[in-house]
């Protein structure tokens, strides 16, 4: 039986009386790529922020690697790497110095931070640009640096929040290849996106999210099988079937 690594139970979060997440529950298994698929404003980012200890839920519980996020937040946090939707970079620093800085923030000594930084830059295909300032990089390259930073400290669980928004095909494919390679090494991944084709390619299971709630959860194949032939139906069709509107509305 697969080992549970992330367990979210009945998560609720509101801001100024407006519900952002209402009763979300799911389990992510160790070594799985699990997707949250939904339009902007569906509650995906709020869910990740609760899971990563940035926000405390109004109600509900989260367990990561056996640790309760609410009661053992420091222990849970050490297992997590977060690649946020917004770029978290120092543009006046080089790619290498960015990674070293964030590695030191993770508690690595100087030698370990430099070693991991070079390894992560190679992983995302930017080792030859290590000494260049990030300000000179394209949007796609900055996204790849964002991912490399999230891997500093060698987390067991990686949160990726819309990591391919607005980037070029080469960088998108590099990010996909990197994620798939990390999974082969045992990494557990939570991937949020509003691009159905990304969820279909990468994720073993997908939770379709709308209005702060999960409206369907299964493998992409099974979700598509619910409404037609999996070879002819897309996850966009599934979303339309469940909500009556397009995923991109």
Regions found by a protein language model. Name each.
Residues 60-71, 75-76:
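Conserved ABC transporter NBD signature motif
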Residues 100, 104, 111-129:
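Conserved ABC ATPase "signature" region
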Residues 154:
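Conserved catalytic motifs of ABC-family nucleotide-binding domains
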Residues 158-161:
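Catalytic Walker B motif of ABC-type/P-loop ATPase nucleotide-binding domains
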Residues 217-218:
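ABC ATPase "signature
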């Amino acid at each position: 039986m697969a080992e549970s690594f992330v367990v979210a139970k009945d998560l609720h979060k509101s801001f100024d009386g407006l519900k952002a997440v209402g009763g979300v529950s799911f389990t992510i298994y160790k070594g799985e790529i699990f997707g949250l698929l939904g339009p902007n404003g569906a509650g995906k980012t709020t869910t990740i922020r609760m899971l990563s200890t940035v926000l405390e839920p109004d109600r509900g519980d989260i367990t990561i690697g056996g640790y309760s996020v609410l009661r053992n937040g420091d222990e849970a946090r050490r297992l997590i790497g977060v690649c946020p939707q917004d770029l978290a970079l120092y543009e006046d620093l080089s790619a290498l110095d960015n990674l070293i800085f964030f590695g030191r923030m993770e508690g690595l000594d100087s030698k370990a931070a430099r070693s991991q930084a070079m390894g992560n830059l190679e992983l995302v295909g930017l080792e030859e640009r290590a000494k260049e300032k990030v300000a000179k990089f394209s949007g796609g390259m900055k996204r790849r640096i964002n991912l490399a930073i999230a891997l500093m400290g060698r987390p067991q669980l990686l949160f990726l929040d819309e990591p391919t928004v607005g980037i070029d095909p080469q960088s998108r494919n590099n990010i996909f290849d990197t994620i798939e390679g990390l999974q082969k090494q045992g990494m557990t991944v939570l991937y949020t996106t509003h691009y159905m084709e990304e969820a279909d390619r990468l994720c073993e299971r997908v939770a379709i999210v709308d209005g702060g709630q999960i409206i369907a959860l299964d493998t992409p194949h099974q979700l598509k099988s619910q409404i037609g032939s999996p070879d002819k139906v897309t996850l966009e069709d599934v979303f339309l079937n469940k909500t009556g509107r397009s995923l991109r509305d």
